[in-house]
Amino acid sequence: MILRAALLLVLTGLLAGCVSSGTVDPLKTDEGRQQARDAYIQLGIGYLQQGAAARAKTPLRKALEIDPRSADAHAALALVFQTEMENDLADKHYREALSSRKDA
């Protein structure tokens, strides 16, 4: 019985050691920021595809907070404004998207 209790304690300790402490903020790494930006862009595009253009703005703006030069975020936001007939804002974001392209 004592052996079982000791074994259970050791296994519990080992498992607890395998759990990440979660102290690393994923937005502090380039990879984490890119993943967050891409997730926000996909969420915004999803809302736009569902016809929720106004709702798409929030995640797309968050993507731009993470990466203000994201061509994809600017292009998606331009589509949102175009859908809402906000032509000046759409034009602004289309131009930002074009100037932000890495291969331009």
Predicted features and spans:
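Structural marker of alpha-solenoid helical repeat scaffolds
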Residues: 32, 66, 99-101
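Bacterial Sec signal peptide processing site at the extreme N-terminus
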Residues: 15-35
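Register position in tetratricopeptide repeats
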Residues: 49, 83-84
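Residue-level recognition of tetratricopeptide repeat
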Residues: 36, 70, 103-104
